[in-house]
Amino acid sequence: MLDCLVGSEMCIRDRGGNTSDMINIWKRHNLIKVFKDAYEKGIILSGISAGAVCWFDWILSDSVNKELSPLKGINFLDGSCTPHSSDNNRLRQFISEIKDGNLPDGIAIDDGVAVLFIDGVPSEVYSSRINHDAYYVTKHDKISLKTYIKKLNG
């Protein structure tokens, strides 16, 4: 039944919540496979907050013990991600976790910002707020994701 419902949709949107609980519920009910099949059929997967970052290999999340720490994602998108990076403490910790080798290179997304991925690659950044952006973070650098996308496109 769920396969039929998801198969008829053009977009799946996750509104967020507790990232760890959400991923565990998805695993328990085999929804990760359903979402993967939908993704492979071209259905758009989207979300905000926890719902935006769950698709990555790794997440910086406060959903376990209310403290920011690395959390395994569902591996649809390479690297790591954190939402709410307009909170400077979260952004600093994300950068620190990457520099320390606890997270792979990744994307930090400010509140009010959306990132469009096509075939697993970031291709557009949209912001509804002035001075809010998304960033590509490595062990050595933090740059605007828009700049990183321009470099990818040569």
Cite the ranges covered by each PLM segment:
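C-terminal and late-domain segments of enzyme folds
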Residues: 59-61, 65-154
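Single conserved hydrophobic/aromatic residue that forms the stacking wall/gate
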Residues: 1-7, 11
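Alpha-helix/helix-capping structural signal
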Residues: 17, 50-51, 113, 120
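Class I SAM-dependent methyltransferase SAM-binding "motif I" and its flanking Rossmann-like core
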Residues: 15, 21-92
